[in-house]
Amino acid sequence: MGTEAGSAPVVRGRGLKVHHLRPAPGAHKSKIRVGRGEGSKGKTAGRGTKGSKARKQVPARFEGGQMPLHMRLPKLKGFRNRFRVEYQVVNVATLAELFPQGGEVTKADLAARGAVRGKSPVKVLGNGDINVALHVSADAFSASAKEKIAAAGGSVTQS
């Protein structure tokens, strides 16, 4: 076992072990303890004399008497309804593209084809044209979507 200049002890022949590791010299500086005796950083501990800065901490949000940021910004208007139901939208034109042969269409079918995701409610809107008879089951329908699906020979089921 020997040491090389300025490094941790090296164990010869037995490999490096965790308990032999040491930080590099000068890597860890000791914390300066302030206000302990008459030396540097003693007595007033580098805070000067008197005043609120010497007696206690000034709040982090304090801007030196300037109008604070939270008072300079405008107030937010309105509110956000926590109970609002956010629908995933599918148009009748999309239904006609995804199901050209017609038939039964459910939320699971739409999710399988990538038109909607997961468990959020689905609303069918009447944008576009439809010419196949579809029997659509969804959470909500617009009036124009109901008309177009019925006109094409299909039916609507609200689940």
From Swiss-Prot:
Signal peptide: none annotated. Residues 21-34 have a biased composition (Basic residues). Residues 21-55 are annotated as: Disordered. It comes from the Bacteria. It holds the Pfam family Ribosomal_L27A. It comes from Frankia casuarinae (strain DSM 45818 / CECT 9043 / HFP020203 / CcI3). Binds to the 23S rRNA. Keywords: Ribonucleoprotein, Ribosomal protein, RNA-binding, rRNA-binding. The gene is rplO. This is Large ribosomal subunit protein uL15. PROSITE patterns: RIBOSOMAL_L15 (PS00475). Belongs to the universal ribosomal protein uL15 family. One of its GO terms (molecular function) is structural constituent of ribosome. GO terms for biological process: translation. Part of the 50S ribosomal subunit. SUPFAM superfamilies: Ribosomal proteins L15p and L18e (SSF52080). GO terms for cellular component: cytosolic large ribosomal subunit.
